[in-house]
C-alpha cells in the first residue's frame, strides 16, 4: 500500500509540471445539440464525441483519451458483467456524462479544465451506489472483468491525468476491495516513470557538469 501512495505522489508531481504552460481557451466549434444532451442523460458514449466536436482538444484530450475510451471499453465488456453489475455500470456512466453536460453546454472552455472536470466527475460518481451496489461490492462481484477493464493501457491513460484523488480512489480504495491486479499494474507503471525521471535527472546533471 505504501508503494501505491508513493507512486501517487510521483505521478501527480510529474504531471504538475505541465500546468506551468496551461491550455488556451477553446471557443465552441458547433452549437449545443439536443441529441448530445440526450446522450449525456443516457450515459451514451456518443456524448464524448459531442464534447470533442464542440471543444476540440485532440487525441490527448479528456473526451477522446479518457471519456470515450473508458466508456467504449465498458460497453465492449458489458456482456461479461453480472446482471446487477451491468446496472451499476450503466448508472456510473450516466452519472459521469450528466455531470459533464454543463461543461459541454458552456460558452468556452480550456482543455485542462475539461480534463479536471472529467477526473472529478469520475471520482465523485464512484462514491455513489447504483442498483443497490457500492463500488466495492461491484468490484468484488465482477473482479475478472474489472481487471480486464483496467488493463495496462487504461492504467497508463489514468496516470496521464495526474489527478491524485482519482488515482487514490481507483487504485488504493480499489486494492482494499480486492482489485490488487489493477493496483499492481499502477505500481509497475509508476516504477517505470520513476526510472525515466531518474534518467532525465542524471542526464541534466551530466550536462551541467560538462558546461
Please name every model-derived segment.
Residues 1-16:
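Cleavable N-terminal signal peptides of Sec/SRP-targeted secreted and luminal proteins
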Amino acid at each position: 500500500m505504501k508503494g501505491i501512495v508513493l507512486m501517487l505522489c510521483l505521478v501527480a508531481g510529474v504531471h504538475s509540471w505541465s500546468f506551468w504552460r496551461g491550455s488556451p481557451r477553446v471557443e465552441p466549434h458547433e452549437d449545443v445539440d439536443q441529441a448530445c444532451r440526450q446522450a449525456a442523460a443516457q450515459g451514451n458514449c456518443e456524448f464524448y464525441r459531442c464534447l470533442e466536436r464542440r471543444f476540440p482538444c485532440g487525441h490527448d484530450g479528456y473526451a477522446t483519451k479518457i471519456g470515450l475510451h473508458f466508456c467504449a471499453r465498458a460497453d465492449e465488456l458489458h456482456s461479461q458483467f453480472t446482471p446487477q453489475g451491468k446496472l451499476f455500470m450503466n448508472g456510473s456512466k450516466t452519472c459521469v456524462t450528466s455531470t459533464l453536460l454543463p461543461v459541454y453546454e458552456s460558452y468556452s472552455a480550456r482543455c485542462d479544465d475539461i480534463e479536471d472536470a472529467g477526473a472529478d466527475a469520475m471520482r465523485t460518481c464512484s462514491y455513489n451506489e447504483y442498483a443497490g451496489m457500492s463500488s466495492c461490492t461491484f468490484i468484488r462481484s465482477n473482479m475478472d472483468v474489472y481487471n480486464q477493464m483496467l488493463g495496462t493501457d487504461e492504467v497508463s491513460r489514468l496516470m496521464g491525468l495526474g489527478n491524485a484523488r482519482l488515482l487514490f480512489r481507483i487504485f488504493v480504495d480499489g486494492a482494499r476491495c480486492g482489485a490488487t491486479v489493477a493496483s499492481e499494474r499502477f505500481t509497475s507503471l509508476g516504477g517505470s516513470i520513476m526510472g525515466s525521471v531518474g534518467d532525465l535527472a542524471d542526464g541534466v546533471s551530466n550536462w551541467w557538469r560538462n558546461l
